[in-house]
């Protein structure tokens, strides 16, 4: 079985080798764990953002950033492009931000390959029938501070590896790398909704691709949390190749999948978050989805699509100003 940790290790090693070129910093902790600062005390880079995103996806996806990417003729933003031939494992078995790390004063959302060793959350791995038994643990952290030895020890223990084999990559939401990796979740937003909200067997998704604009750096972590979510919810476009069976209603799936099917659709995410008293669990799960979904049913040959980009919301979210 493919190992998301072993597939990601060469990418991590390449980042370490090219740290100066990528504007990142490599920190060796006293217990032997390795921290890659991709945006806390450094600037990061587009290349670091691509590598970080690819690691989040367990090394099982191609990731590109196109500065010429457009949401529409009205609005030009750089875009992240993702394609994978292992969508369930790459997005849900690795990329899903399913591990909350809360140790002392350190807090982060954890995603990436190490989740497959710790099996967090366990139900996800049972659904996709996947496990990893590598002796190295690579965890991507969305955080505004760097982890210490205690955090590394915690990860090592949960993953069943020696702490010297732990790699922790860190990028704040309000950093270039952080913004890129969140937009890089465009495909995962769809597979997550398929599994968690629509209870569709994601193992039937055989190939997937997606593109989403990258939010510019417009403010602090809270402002960027809103903007980065909006990039996918109102600008993300996805394509799923599905091997259905006779009982699947692919057209109904396609209509239910995009963010426009949610009751919270139509306003910047930060407004929705504030209305929910800053509680993610009060927000409709169906909101976390790409704007556009295209499904190719490989069994029937059908090609269906639903949803569209919402440029006006993107402009409002970013405070986009067209100069005259």
Swiss-Prot record:
Classification via Pfam families: MCH
SUPFAM superfamilies, sorted: Methenyltetrahydromethanopterin cyclohydrolase
One GO BP: one-carbon metabolic process
Reactions catalysed: 5,10-methenyl-5,6,7,8-tetrahydromethanopterin + H2O = N(5)-formyl-5,6,7,8-tetrahydromethanopterin + H(+)
Pathway given in the UniProt record: One-carbon metabolism; methanogenesis from CO(2); 5,10-methenyl-5,6,7,8-tetrahydromethanopterin from CO(2): step 3/3
Compartments (UniProt record): Cytoplasm
Primary location group: cytoplasm
Protein's recorded name: Methenyltetrahydromethanopterin cyclohydrolase
Family the entry assigns: Belongs to the MCH family.
Keywords: Cytoplasm, Hydrolase, Methanogenesis, One-carbon metabolism
Record organism: Methanococcus aeolicus (strain ATCC BAA-1280 / DSM 17508 / OCM 812 / Nankai-3)
GO cellular component: cytoplasm
Disulfide bonds: none
Record-linked NCBIfam families: one_C_mch
EC numbers: 3.5.4.27
Enzyme class per UniProt: hydrolase
CDD domains in alphabetical order: MCH
Function of the molecule: Catalyzes the reversible interconversion of 5-formyl-H(4)MPT to methenyl-H(4)MPT(+).
């Amino acid at each position: 079985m493919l190992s998301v940790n072993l597939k990601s290790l060469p990418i991590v090693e390449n980042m370490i080798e090219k740290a100066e070129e990528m504007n990142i910093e490599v920190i060796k902790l006293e217990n032997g764990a390795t921290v890659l600062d991709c945006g806390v005390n450094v600037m990061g880079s587009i290349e670091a953002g691509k590598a970080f995103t690819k690691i989040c996806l367990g090394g099982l996806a191609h990731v590109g950033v196109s500065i010429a990417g457009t949401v529409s003729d009205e609005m030009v933003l750089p875009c992240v492009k993702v394609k994978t031939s292992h969508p369930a494992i790459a997005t849900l078995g690795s990329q899903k931000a399913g591990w909350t790390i809360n140790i002392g004063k350190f807090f982060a959302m954890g995603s990436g390959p190490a989740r497959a060793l710790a099996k967090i959350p366990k139900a996800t791995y049972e659904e996709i029938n996947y496990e990893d038994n590598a002796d190295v643990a690579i965890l991507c952290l969305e955080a505004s501070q760097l982890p210490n030895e205690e955090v590394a020890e915690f990860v090592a223990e949960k993953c069943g590896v020696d702490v010297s084999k732990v790699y922790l990559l860190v990028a704040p939401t309000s950093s270039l790398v952080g913004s890129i990796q969140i937009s890089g979740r465009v495909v995962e937003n769809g597979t997550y909704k398929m599994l968690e909200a629509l209870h569709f067997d994601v193992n039937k998704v055989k190939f997937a691709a997606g593109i989403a604009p990258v939010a510019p750096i417009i403010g602090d972590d809270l402002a960027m949390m809103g903007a980065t979510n909006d990039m996918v919810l109102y600008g993300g476009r996805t394509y799923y190749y599905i091997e259905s069976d006779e009982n699947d209603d692919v057209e109904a799936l396609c209509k239910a999948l995009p963010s426009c099917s949610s009751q919270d659709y139509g306003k910047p995410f930060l407004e929705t978050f504030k209305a929910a008293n800053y509680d993610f669990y009060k927000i409709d799960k169906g909101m976390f989805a790409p704007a556009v979904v295209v499904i190719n049913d490989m069994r029937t040959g059908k090609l269906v699509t639903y949803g569209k980009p919402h440029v006006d919301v993107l402009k409002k979210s970013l405070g986009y100003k067209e100069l005259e």
